[in-house]
Swiss-Prot record:
Positions of disulphide bridges: none
InterPro entries: DHS-like_NAD/FAD-binding_dom (IPR029035), NAD-dep_sirtuin_deacylases (IPR050134), Sirtuin (IPR003000), Sirtuin_cat_small_dom_sf (IPR026591), Sirtuin_class_II (IPR026587), Ssirtuin_cat_dom (IPR026590)
Entry annotation: catalytic residues: 144 (proton acceptor)
Name under which the protein is recorded: NAD-dependent protein deacylase SIR2rp2
Membership in a protein family: Belongs to the sirtuin family. Class II subfamily.
Role played: NAD-dependent protein deacylase. Catalyzes the NAD-dependent hydrolysis of acyl groups from lysine residues.
A GO MF label: zinc ion binding
Cofactor: Zn(2+)
Cofactor descriptive note: Binds 1 zinc ion per subunit.
EC class name: transferase
Gene3D superfamilies xrefs: SIR2/SIRT2 'Small Domain (3.30.1600.10), TPP-binding domain (3.40.50.1220)
Length: 320
């Protein structure tokens, strides 16, 4: 049986067995690579690059030079996130959500593309439209935050990342043109491999309320997922899930793997669709090793919802 047929059968069986519940989906970076956003652990991911140096939450908070390094890199790399469009994975999940087949989406991604899917999925880089990446009626929990918002580390002032990008470019005229031309330096989560001279030349934008430092409103490496989010999402899996469907994630970080462990312990079926092995393969009820998560989801939606698979590649609102 084709992967889409296998997945459709799994979802239909779980739905019939667990009436009153719905599929809870956990998505990772493999759902967004087809939107042109690099990942960390894939075959061409960031961890395979020799020049990769991890920026941790602890480094960012204690070292002002690390803050300059982060924002220099982010200023140059944000264009991969700002204006990014959804791919077939996001659009198919939106259709599944509208149909009721998917009850909730938990995402490790910070790109906001699950929000954008509710607006038709077409990228929009205009500053006044940043809300398309941060706000929607999608039943969505962003485990690691959203790159399209920033927060002051001192007073908690909240600001759109698009506004900060504009102010960074005003504060650093010519910076983007001088240092941001090499696409091969693009990294995951709107990051960029900036040369040392770019970091040294970087002028930060400070909080307009207290003159404090801004931090992206995301969970950095070494930082914990906020406890209220963990508690709410664990309860959601326990009380609402007919099954747990993991898409495009290797499950290497515990903040994602915890849901697979929980589902397994509660007898909730687990399916994994990913390119390559994952941490949860040994306890999954179904594992599909695929080249394209988006293609499999589009074909699965065709089988279950009767929508032509080609529709999900057109990035428009799907009428069910």
């Amino acid at each position: 049986m084709r992967p889409a047929g296998t997945l459709a059968s799994f979802l239909e069986r779980c739905s019939a067995r667990k009436r009153g519940r719905g599929c809870v989906v956990l998505t990772g970076a493999g759902c967004s690579t087809e939107s042109g956003i690099p990942d960390y652990r894939g075959p061409n991911g960031q961890y395979h690059r020799a020049d990769f140096v991890l920026l941790t939450f602890q480094k960012f908070m204690r070292d002002d030079n690390e803050k300059r390094r982060y924002w220099a890199r982010s200023m140059l790399g944000y264009s991969t996130m700002c204006g990014a469009s959804c791919n077939a994975a996001h659009m198919a999940l939106q259709a599944f959500t509208k149909s009721g087949a998917v009850a909730h989406i938990l995402t490790q991604n910070v790109d906001g593309l699950h929000h954008l899917a509710t607006y038709g999925g077409v990228g929009d880089a205009e500053e006044e439209h940043y809300y398309k990446y941060t706000t929607s009626d999608a039943p969505l929990k962003e485990l690691h935050g959203n790159i399209h918002n920033v927060i002051c580390t001192s007073c908690g002032f909240f600001m759109p990342r698009a506004r900060l990008q504009r102010e960074l470019r005003e504060r650093n005229p010519g910076f983007y043109e001088q240092y941001g031309a090499d696409v091969s330096r693009t990294r995951p989560d709107g990051d960029y491999s900036a040369p040392t001279e770019a970091v040294n030349a970087m002028h930060l934008v400070m909080c307009p309320r207290c003159n404090g430092f801004f931090k992206p409103h995301v969970v950095l490496f070494g930082e914990n997922v906020p406890k209220p989010i963990v508690e709410a999402t664990m309860s959601l899996v326990r009380d609402k899930a007919s099954c747990l469907l993991c898409l495009g994630t290797s499950l290497q970080v515990y903040s994602a793997y915890r849901y697979v462990l929980q589902a397994n312990q509660l007898g909730i079926p687990v399916a994994i669709v990913n390119a390559g092995t994952t941490r949860g393969d040994a306890i999954a009820d179904l594992k599909l090793d695929v080249e394209s998560v988006g293609s499999v989801l589009a074909e699965t939606a065709h089988e279950m919802l009767g929508v032509p698979a080609s529709m999900f590649f057109r990035r428009k609102t799907i009428q069910l």
